[in-house]
């Protein structure tokens, strides 16, 4: 995210689209990182945390409203939209194509997770990828540490879960310059 925003300082990042998650959940850090990075680089931003639903149709209906709002509020302006996951980014991209028939120069989209839909979309979507190999390796190290601790004569169990942050990577595709 830092790379994407630093690279596009003149670009007006208008929205982070996500569900409103409790601050104690690690996924909240995506929202916090978005805000912190925009503030650090003096980039105006808005958060839209109203996305929730139990079906694709419900989510798509909400995404239509969000897209219409952004499109109406900022005509002719550059709009960078960071979405909570690649599925949301694909929905948003579809809405743009339904209205314009292409991805106008005034829009740039970034998804999150590097899921298959990001590369399979009508235009491959720029995304923030999690380093699954590093996550798996780190998880295994933590598991082995806990197993070794349990072998001790007087094992000391963890007082609370260990949270490790693994640096994600920006995967540039066709929805950003």
Model-predicted segments: where are they?
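Short hydrophobic/charged patches on amphipathic alpha-helices used for structural packing
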Residues: 1, 64-67
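Hinge/beta->alpha junction and helix N-cap segments in small-molecule ligand-binding domains
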Residues: 17-65, 83-90, 112-114, 129-138, ...
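Flexible loop/turn connectors
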Residues: 68-177
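Single conserved hydrophobic/aromatic residue that forms the stacking wall/gate
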Residues: 1-13
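Helix N-cap/coil-helix junction residues
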Residues: 10, 43, 101-102
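Structured catalytic/translocation cores of nucleotide/phosphate-coupled proteins
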Residues: 11, 21-23, 156-158
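Short, cationic motifs built from Arg/Lys/His that form the positively charged side of catalytic pockets
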Residues: 9, 30-31, 146, 173
């Amino acid at each position: 995210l830092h790379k994407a925003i630093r690279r596009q300082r003149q670009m007006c990042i208008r929205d982070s689209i996500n569900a409103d998650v409790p601050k104690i959940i690690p996924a909240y850090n995506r929202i916090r990182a978005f805000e912190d990075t925009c503030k650090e680089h003096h980039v105006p931003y808005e958060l839209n945390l109203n996305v929730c639903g139990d079906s694709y149709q419900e989510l798509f209906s909400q995404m239509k409203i969000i897209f219409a709002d952004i499109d109406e509020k900022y005509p002719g302006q550059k709009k960078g939209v960071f979405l909570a996951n690649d599925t949301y980014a694909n929905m948003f991209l579809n809405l743009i194509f339904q209205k314009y028939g292409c991805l106008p120069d005034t829009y740039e989209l970034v998804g999150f997770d590097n899921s298959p839909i990001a590369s399979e979309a009508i235009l491959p979507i720029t995304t923030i990828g999690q380093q699954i190999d590093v996550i798996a390796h780190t998880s295994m190290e933590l598991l082995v540490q806990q197993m070794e601790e349990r072998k001790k004569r007087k094992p000391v169990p963890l007082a609370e879960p260990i949270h490790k942050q693994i640096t994600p990577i920006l995967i540039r595709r066709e929805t950003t310059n």
